[in-house]
């Protein structure tokens, strides 16, 4: 009986220490409070459209917080995005491509693919995601 207790106590401490480490990693790796983390510096969003608004991971006009040097993916493969070219800009609104921001951006204006954004070190502190065809669909990106 004593041997069993002696073996169980270190096991309990080891398991407790692992769960605390995982909790700490979850908080420090998050670039957005509700976005799934792909790795330490890459996050993906699923883009859909409903009622004339962009939804990112099911949330309408979601405000985002990005970090310089990190990579962000916007998957616009859902059929609801077919007539809504997704792009990143320096001005809010949309409905045109005025202020389109292309530094670090791959596949801008996509309607069926994935826009990739590697945030450059000289990115403005505020950007926006917009639709090139319609105004008022997007949201704000704060760059830190």
Where in this protein do the model-derived segments appear?
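Sec-dependent bacterial lipoprotein signal peptides
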Residues: 1-16
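Solvent-exposed, conformationally flexible loop/turn segments
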Residues: 67-71, 112
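Residue-level hotspots at or immediately adjacent to binding/recognition sites across diverse folds
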Residues: 74
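Substrate/ligand-engaging "lid" and interaction regions
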Residues: 95-99, 110
């Amino acid at each position: 009986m004593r041997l069993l207790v002696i073996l169980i106590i270190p096991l309990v401490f080891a398991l407790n220490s692992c769960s605390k480490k995982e909790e700490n990693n979850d908080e420090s790796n998050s670039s957005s409070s509700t976005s799934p983390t792909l790795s330490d510096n890459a996050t993906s969003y699923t883009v859909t459209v409903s009622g004339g608004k962009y939804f990112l991971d099911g949330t309408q006009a979601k405000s985002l917080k990005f970090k310089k040097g990190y990579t962000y993916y916007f998957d616009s493969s859902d059929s609801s995005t077919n007539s809504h070219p997704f792009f990143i800009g320096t001005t809010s609104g949309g409905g045109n491509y005025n202020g389109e921001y292309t530094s670090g951006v791959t596949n801008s204006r996509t309607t069926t693919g994935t826009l990739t954004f590697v945030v450059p070190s000289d990115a403005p502190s505020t950007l926006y995601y917009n639709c090139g065809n319609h105004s008022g669909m997007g949201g704000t990106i704060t760059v830190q």
